[in-house]
């Protein structure tokens, strides 16, 4: 409990900008499924029911808020649930980057992550053929490592 309180207080001060943006996004998504994932607030939103301008949000972290888009029809599928858990761990790693970089997070992590995401998914077949994983570069590789390390720690 103390760990979560410290995490939230740092996110709301040092990571204020991205946490405020995350809170706004959470409110814009409306009534969706919210829960704590470790210390962060995770929103699993149904991509078919959110407002049009939010449909392409994908999976993203903003401060202490994690957003994962999923089609409601696929929500109970075990393979998809396992993949969502892996994505949640990765996105949780981004929340640790927020703790480290604070007000510079959006410049150091957010912008490069967005550019890499757009580039990777526009050339996915080419990168896959060359054996290049989405998670092979900064900041994605670091986020995955942080998410894995956080998952190994005792609660």
What are these regions (language model features)?
Residues 1-2, 94:
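A short, terminal or domain-edge coil/loop segment
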Residues 2-55, 61, 66-70, 106-155:
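Metalloprotease/metallohydrolase-associated module, dominated by Zn2+-dependent proteases
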Residues 56, 82-86, 105:
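Alpha-helical hydrophobic/aromatic positions enriched in membrane-embedded helices and signal peptides
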Residues 67-89, 134:
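Short pre-active-site segment immediately N-terminal to the catalytic Zn-binding motif
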Residues 86-98:
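Active-site recognition of the HExxH zinc-binding catalytic motif
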Residues 99-107:
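Transmembrane alpha-helical segments and their cytosolic interface motifs
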């Amino acid at each position: 409990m103390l760990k979560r309180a410290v995490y939230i207080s740092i996110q709301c001060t040092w990571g204020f900008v991205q946490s405020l943006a995350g809170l706004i996004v959470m409110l814009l998504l409306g009534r969706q499924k919210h829960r704590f994932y470790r210390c962060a607030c995770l929103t699993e939103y149904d991509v078919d029911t959110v407002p049009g301008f939010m449909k392409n949000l994908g999976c993203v972290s903003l401060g202490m808020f994690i957003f994962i888009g999923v089609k409601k029809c696929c929500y109970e599928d075990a393979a998809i649930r396992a993949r969502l858990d892996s994505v949640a761990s990765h996105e949780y790693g981004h929340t640790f980057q927020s703790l480290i970089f604070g007000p510079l997070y959006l410049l150091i992590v957010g912008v490069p992550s967005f550019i890499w995401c757009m580039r990777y998914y526009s050339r996915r077949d080419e990168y896959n053929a060359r054996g290049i994983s989405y998670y092979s570069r900064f900041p994605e590789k670091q986020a995955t490592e942080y998410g894995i390390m956080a998952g190994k720690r005792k609660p």
